[in-house]
Amino acid sequence: MADLPESAQVVVIGGGVVGASVLYHLTKAGWTDAILLERRELTAGSTWHAAGGMHTLNGDPNVAALQRYTVQLYEDLEKESGVSCGVHLTGEVMLADDADRMDWLRMAHARGRYLGMETELISVAEAAEKIPFLVEEHFVGALWDPVGGHVDPSGVTHAYATAARMAGAQVHRNTWAHDVVQRPDGLWDVVTERGTITCEHFVNCGGLWAREVGRMCGIELPILAMEHMYLLTEEIPEIRPWLDATGGYGIGAVDFGGEIYTRAEAGGLLLGTYEQACVPWSERETPWDFGSQLLAPDLERLAPSLAVAFEHFPIYADAGIRQVINGPFTFAPDGNPVIGPVRGQRGHWVACGVMAGLSQGGGVGLSMANWMTSGDPGFDVWGMDVARFGDWTTPSYTRAKVMENYSRRFSISFPNEELPAARPLHTSPIYDRLDDANAVWGSSYGLETALWFQQDGAEPIEDVTYHRSNAFDVVAEEVHAVRTGVGLIETTGFAKHQFTGPGARALLDRVLANRIPAPGRMALAPMLNHDGKLIGDFTVATLADPFDGAETFLVLGSGVAEGYHERWFREQIASHLADGGGCDGDVNYRPLGTELAGLSIAGPKARDVLAAVASPTSPSSGGTGSDVSTDAFAFRDIQRMDLGMVPAIVGRITFTGDLGYECWVPTSLQQRLFDLLMEAGEPYGIRLFGLRALDSMRFDKGFGGWASEFRPIYTPAESGLDSFVALTSSDGSDRNFIGRDAAAAARAAGPERRLCTFTLDDGGTPTGNSDDGTTESGTASDVLGDEPIWHGGEVVGWATSGGYAHWSQASCAMGYVPAAAADPATPPDAFEIEVLGVRRPATRRDEPLFDPTGIRMRG
């Protein structure tokens, strides 16, 4: 056994397929002073007993892109390492047994267009030609993926490790990392029974033991292992002709309705399922002496799935069972991997919860290596970033959500579906009031948020669908109430970041791409990474203490990105101080979370409501008192103001694109403010509205949103935010914010693509040019996001979000297309957007549908 080095640039803990992939990709990126530590043998844990299935399809196109990379990598990996990965690209048939699942397949097929995937919608008869032992009457259609197949999990892992060793990395087996400690100088000591390695970075790829490794560093990762079973049949002579005709390996199939997957294996068949009666494994901690063991099978749990298999694939009914494999795999609450840097612990990285390691491991490894070596993952990994989870993901929460996710692994996720497990968790003080108003609830970053308000006497439930739901007419009423009078929405779910201290303005001037406003003003401010890509869109507000003039900065942004942005802010504060930008105490940063509650009123009568509750204020408060006229309280002003007896921070801004105000108060005072505003608004017909109506109104204005239009793969010039990027200070000197040079270069070169708003036909008259010859999916439906945009008979872009703009009475979409197609000189009506498999005519809108001059918002 080779001696253990005393130091390394990076240590990877865990020798499963993910750890080996991270090591391999680090060496490809030039970090060869890298060590992988494996407690036992490579693949011990989950990898060794995996079924080895791989495919490129995923509900998140960004994850699908990484899966495609993984599958494409295997051929080169075999050549590079000399180790066989056991790749069998048999192709895979995805089967739908009802209209909803067929809609999902249409969406998956359409999304694959702009990713370059070669899927094909096929009939049931065509599916039966590929899987001759299925019963056609149980299905309505299918999707053919020629790239699906399976690999040898052990071969893949050893190929990664071998190639990494050939590049200079080290792999140490039978070396247990039983402690990880951060030193005062910021380096990490990885303590093993064979010695201690000091490193700059370490990566937790612990798999089944990732929780234990995280706890060594004081964090609780939101992952849990679940028992997962699949069975192998005896040889089945009847399938021999099929095997011979397909090169000996058959063709894989996924039966979404039956919640089963199947493929050929050793002259027989393999059948796996994600059963409803799922069972967590080792809930509190994973035993360190667990290794290459299997768990006791429980066929009774599989009985419902087997009954479906016998009906849909009768050949299983007479097949003998050779072996039942039951082994643990780790899952995150939403089923996606958990990767990236750990907030507040520089040099600590995680790559765990990758339950589909043979499909996703390569992409995860590449993203991690890019991130660690260059500061950016190189892909849009928002859906996998560890920062998407906050401190609210306790072990009990994780258990409930993981079990829910596992049991729904092959279930359809509808775009308007809100899953009930572990809810409600966090609620605001007015939760009961909104609930009494018949709110239909969603959840965002652990907080319950009102989506819309059902009519009195009706159940507050939204029908899940890919089409327009029972919320449609009610949301229209909410929008009408706002546009013609006044509405109130809770905004507690927005992220609130507070900065104080003598160095706070200088820090924000470096972190945000727009100029920091003067006291009493607000500004829209993108945040960029070093490559000039968008990593945040904020409203930054400056408040000055009326006595000593000390400034407080509120940076308001997307609630779901609170942890993501907190991590970046803390990293930049540390870098700012290290670069001589001040000393400890010069910048005080605090994410306010639910300490500060929010209510927003919007609509042409919003000023009247605010005037009715605004109290005369002493000059020492710095506010204008009860004068809320445009002259005294202009667009993007912010001030401290007493609303009745409630001291509040009020900003004149709203995401509705209308006249409006955001009111921020301590959480303990939210109920009183809510009652006050509702009472004052009664003469004006004030109505509660939710996020569905807010979304509808943003389409009126063409406002983009975080995680849809604004993501780390776009630049300000592409996304329409370039006007909020200030390259110079007010005195004309160059600013020095992060990403400035890249943003300046992008502005000079001009964007290659642009964000546009489109309107589509009414959604009830499909054109009939769907791939599978049907038209029913086009009825009463809107763009959801990730649909391909056609121009000139080719796919040129993709939709980022969509819905119905009720005030403008238009089905809308936002999306990115080449700059030439976005040019006003290009005919605006030459587009199509593929909605549920139907290409619908779309018109580019170069001006907002509502209030194009902004007079309602600014007046």
Which ranges hold each PLM region?
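Conserved, structured C-terminal
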Residues: P415-G442, T449-L451, H467, L543-A550, ...
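Glycine-rich FAD pyrophosphate-binding loop
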Residues: T27-W48
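Flavin-dependent oxidoreductases
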Residues: S21, D179-L295, P304-H312, S396-E418, ...
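Beta1/beta-strand and adjacent pyrophosphate-binding region of the FAD-binding site
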Residues: L4-V18, I35
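Flavin (FAD/FMN) cofactor-binding and adjacent substrate-gating region
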Residues: D76, E80, D97-A167, H172-R173, ...
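Dinucleotide-binding Rossmann-like beta1-alpha1 core, especially the glycine-rich loop
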Residues: G52-K130, G257-T262, G268, A296, ...
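Acidic, proline/glycine-enriched N-terminal capping motif
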Residues: R388-L528, K533
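C-terminal catalytic lobe of FAD-dependent flavoproteins
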Residues: G257, W288-L425
